Amino acid sequence: MTKTLTKHLQAIKAEGKGLFIPYIMAGDHDKGLDGLFDTISFLEAQGVSAIEIGIPWSDPVADGPVIELAGQRSLVKGTSLASIIARLQEKKTQVPLVIMTYFNPVFQYGVETFVADLQNTSVKGLIIPDLPHEQESFIKPYLENLDLALVPLVSLTTGLERQKELIEDARGFVYAVAINGVTGKTGNYRDDLDKHLKHLTEIAQIPVLTGFGVSTLADIKRFNQVSDGVIVGSKIVKGLHEGMQEEIKDFIYAGSHYQK
């Protein structure tokens, strides 16, 4: 199966719009998890394509300082993977949700139980940045025949054969990493980035979204020209935490209503 997320994104593409997926950290709110659906509703109102929800973890190897701090704020409030899933089971959302988590919390929760419990939520995609493709067998058998896509990350350092392998096996969408390193790093894009993104978009049968370092309107325009859209994390997380709703509202609107 694993169709809902891809079909939803492809329908937006068919309207000539760029895709825009914001990232939020679950529990990073004045009200903790009680504010999760408030944030989701706010983002849905701006016309986002889907919403990526981060699971806080004590050793976030792929997170930049903004998201790492957000995770720490969430953990201090007592947020856990179990409490997040329980909250997500309370209410369905208008757009698909994508969980971004490290593998350790999933392993501790129980992989089979984790996948089963997500079936009663609006989560249609999973991103596990520290789970190598060769070790996806830890979770893939539990995803068979379920509407839950394991989204691959493809970076500039991924070899051509490896790219082909990842994309042929991809579900949901392809997460194209614009900058090597942690999230939130901006600028300093490699000269061959646009060529790389165009190549991925040409060979993939599902949408390709660009993330890591996307933080300006110029980034949105640039990456919509060479891929299907963008994923924005640090700018959204920082804006929500600092109460800059109107500023990020305009930014999100520009991204979610970008006309190809």
From Swiss-Prot:
Alphabetized UniProt keyword annotations: Amino-acid biosynthesis, Aromatic amino acid biosynthesis, Lyase, Tryptophan biosynthesis
Assembly information from the UniProt record: Tetramer of two alpha and two beta chains.
One MF term in the entry's GO annotations: tryptophan synthase activity
Keyword Amino-acid biosynthesis: yes
E.C. no: 4.2.1.20
Domain of life: Bacteria
Task performed by this protein: The alpha subunit is responsible for the aldol cleavage of indoleglycerol phosphate to indole and glyceraldehyde 3-phosphate.
InterPro entries (UniProt xref): Aldolase_TIM (IPR013785), RibuloseP-bd_barrel (IPR011060), Trp_synthase_alpha_AS (IPR018204), Trp_synthase_suA (IPR002028)
Family: Belongs to the TrpA family.
The protein's name in its UniProt record: Tryptophan synthase alpha chain
Organism: Streptococcus mutans serotype c (strain ATCC 700610 / UA159)
Pathway it works in: Amino-acid biosynthesis; L-tryptophan biosynthesis; L-tryptophan from chorismate: step 5/5
Transmembrane parts of this sequence: none
Stored PROSITE patterns: TRP_SYNTHASE_ALPHA
Catalytic activity, as annotated: (1S,2R)-1-C-(indol-3-yl)glycerol 3-phosphate + L-serine = D-glyceraldehyde 3-phosphate + L-tryptophan + H2O
Active site residues per record: 52 (proton acceptor), 63 (proton acceptor)
GO cellular component assignments: cytosol
Alphabetized NCBIfam families for the sequence: trpA
Keyword Membrane: no
Broad class of enzyme this protein falls into: lyase
